[in-house]
Amino acid sequence: QFHDAVKSNVAGRLDEVKDLIEEIEKRAEAMCIQERLYREGKLKKRTNHCDTKVNNMMFDAETDKVLCVIDLDTVMPGFVLSDIGDFIRTGANTGAEDDENLDNVNVNMDIFKAYTRGYMEKAKSFLTPTEIKLLPYGGRLLTYMQTVRFLTDYINGDTYYKIHSPKHNLIRTKAQFKLLQSLEAHAGEMDAFMSEWL
């Protein structure tokens, strides 16, 4: 869809987003690791929620502990990296998904570490070393994918996501891309943190 949107440029917005398109294209090959490893038999599909953003979790009002996961209509076979990645994208972001002030948008490493530590307490027994090693990549992948989705919709004239202003999808794109850059900048620290379970 992204390449079709760029090719057709139906809303005439291509010129203002060429720099973002270049950044997406530059990362495209690196974002195919999950599928490549699956084809090579090094990564398997599991039962996944497939929409593990923070607002699909119910929290206890007094303790802030997670009570349960909701929105179960999305459960299907998928990759652990995607489920982890969407939580990192939404839960460890210091800004809003559509934050206009990009200075607000970064990865909160304390949240990343706390979430990962809690997840690994339960998941270490069944995850493969490849999955464990690639959990931080899942955050980058899902943030990249959401950047592409918002940008594609902006190029197409805002036909998929509900918008609240004419530039809303562009604002979302830039905020997600800033988060991606922050995740990339912290990749070494995240990878080192994961070595505790390898």
Residue ranges and their predicted role:
Residues Q1-H49, V54-C68, L141, T159-S165, ...:
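ATP-dependent phospho-/nucleotidyl transfer catalytic cores
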Residues I24, Y115, L134-L135:
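A structural signal for short hydrophobic/aromatic patches embedded in well-ordered alpha helices
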Residues I70-V75:
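Activation of the activation-loop gatekeeper triad in protein kinase-fold domains
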Residues P77, L81-K124, L141-Y160:
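Active-site activation/catalytic loop segments of kinase-like enzymes and analogous catalytic loops
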